[in-house]
Amino acid sequence: MKASDVRDMTPDQLQDELLKLKKTQFNLRFQGASGQLEKVHQMRQVRRDIARIKTIQRQRSAETASKS
């Protein structure tokens, strides 16, 4: 997921995507712990996607706070 794609999302879409990614991260952690995870790079991708979404959310909240 690219940052430009994340910036185009609405706040509700961002929240939904964040919840979906957190569930995915949870499942990947269990797969990794039990030795069933074949694509180890997915954990890194999901973690970075979560960080991108949280960064965009934080930037938007900072923008609205500075406008007030």
Curated annotation (Swiss-Prot):
One Gene Ontology cellular component: cytosolic large ribosomal subunit
Name of encoding gene: rpmC
Any single GO BP term: translation
InterPro entries found in the cross-reference section: Ribosomal_protein_uL29 (IPR050063), Ribosomal_uL29 (IPR001854), Ribosomal_uL29_sf (IPR036049)
PANTHER family: 60S RIBOSOMAL PROTEIN L35/50S RIBOSOMAL PROTEIN L29 (PTHR10916), LARGE RIBOSOMAL SUBUNIT PROTEIN UL29C (PTHR10916:SF0)
Domain of life assignment: Bacteria
Presence of the UniProt keyword DNA repair in the record: no
One Pfam family of this chain: Ribosomal_L29
Record family assignment: Belongs to the universal ribosomal protein uL29 family.
Molecular function as annotated in GO: structural constituent of ribosome
Gene3D superfamilies in the cross-refs: 1.10.287.310
Origin species: Parvibaculum lavamentivorans (strain DS-1 / DSM 13023 / NCIMB 13966)
Protein name: Large ribosomal subunit protein uL29
Record key words, sorted: Ribonucleoprotein, Ribosomal protein
